[in-house]
Amino acid sequence: MDDIITLKNILSNDDVNWFLDAMDSIKDPQDRAGSNKLYVPRGELGKQVKLRVIEKIHSLYPDKNIHTVNFYDIVKPYGMHSDTVKFTMQGIIPLEFIDGSAYTLIYHQTSDTNIELVPEDKPEDYKPFFNKGVRDPSTIEGWTPGYKISEKDGQKYWQDKWHYYKEAYKGFSIKHSYEWKIGDIFLFHTKYLHSATCSQSRKKGIMFCLN
């Protein structure tokens, strides 16, 4: 089976609205990267969210369950990282985005450990999320020196911040670009490094991992 999959238009408007209502019902979001918010569904709500997600992907993964699921509201795009808690499939469900086009980028480079790519000019008090640590990019599988992302793609995905990301992501190459469409479910293997882009001002969605 492919390790990057898009299930197009698999969610109805009612499905999307149910998820948005579920997200809004969570009154204790966690702060992430300043203005970003993470909403964790617990108890009966968590069970219902997992059930509704797994129903949509059951035909692809009949023997899998949801290991982790949460909602997020992002205004500051997450940089390149991996979520390799375990080798499995990770999913993204777009729920809403404001202006522009939202993308999730999958890179050719992979990792067998949880990492976050942090530039050398990071602030002294910077602490990577989820204790992923700072990694020398040359230790990442598939990384090689040189610029791999085209100027055209750089301007498209990072816009006026491309001059910064061009250097930060030097040596990395884009394997797949998923453009957010409400109604889709996007899945990819957790081994891949991935990132958001600077092409929209805000987006809401669901992230889940299978066990």
PLM regions and their residue ranges:
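Non-heme Fe(II)/2-oxoglutarate
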Residues: 1-80, 103-104, 117-147
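Catalytic core of non-heme Fe(II) oxygenases with the double-stranded beta-helix
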Residues: 75-191, 197-211
